[in-house]
Amino acid sequence: MPSGSTGCCPSGWSDFLLQVAPEKTRLLRFSRFHPSRKRRFAFLGFEFFWLKDRQGIARVKRRTAPKKLQAACRRLKEWIRDHRHLPGREFLRGLNQRLRGHYQYFGVRGNSRALHRFFDWAKACVFKWRNRRGGKRRSFTWAEFTQALKQVAIARPGITEVARRRVFA
């Protein structure tokens, strides 16, 4: 084995000057014949796991990794808190940019629950922080807020992944 190899990755990686951090690397049995809660792993912000689809066929599913969802919520909360003083259109433009970016990266098939959770959390956070813009009186009630959201174009969650088309020749 070449030097720097951990024994868990192909030895050909050294040909490309790639190194693997042994403390971050592990071998995992990831098979549809051995599904369990322990057989999940996170990679590039997604959690990969096996689940049976409607036809009963085991498929690899992806969802937003819980740590990444928490981090995204934390970043969005800080942005909302720091920019709550902006005029409505400017605030919505910045909020929509952040929401769309999240949807475009994490908008894969099977992940709509996490997208909607992020959207609902963002709405609640906007309501909380836009109501704290000075003065003792609240800016608006929840009913007024939801009515206003229907009138403005706030980015809604959606699946952005394009399904692969099977072409038979």
Each predicted region: which residue ranges?
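Non-catalytic terminal/accessory segments
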Residues: 1-169
